[in-house]
Amino acid sequence: MKYTEIKEKSLQELEGLLKEKKLELFGLRMKLKTMQLQDTSAIRKTRKDIARIKTAIAEKRRAG
């Protein structure tokens, strides 16, 4: 997910998206531990998406 897409969303949408991504990351980690995960780079991509979302949330809160 690109930062420009994330930046356009409202604060509530971002918080919902953050929750979804955290659940997705949890699921990916479980798949990794049970040897079911084929694309191990998905964990890194999801972590980066979470960081982008957190950055956008902080930016919106600072702006008011």
Swiss-Prot record:
User: What's any GO biological process attached to this entry?
Assistant: translation
Instruction: Supply the alphabetized keyword list.
Output: Ribonucleoprotein, Ribosomal protein
Which residue pairs form cystines in this protein?
none
Entry keyword Ribosomal protein:
yes
Report if keyword Isomerase is assigned.
Answer: no
Q: Name one Pfam family in it.
A: Ribosomal_L29
Query: Which SUPFAM superfamilies does the protein's record reference?
Result: Ribosomal protein L29 (L29p) (SSF46561)
- GO terms assigned for molecular function: structural constituent of ribosome
Q: Which GO terms describe its cellular component?
A: cytosolic large ribosomal subunit
Signal peptide residue numbers: none
Record family assignment: Belongs to the universal ribosomal protein uL29 family.
Supply the name of the protein.
Large ribosomal subunit protein uL29
Q: Which organism is it from?
A: Nitratiruptor sp. (strain SB155-2)
The encoding gene is rpmC
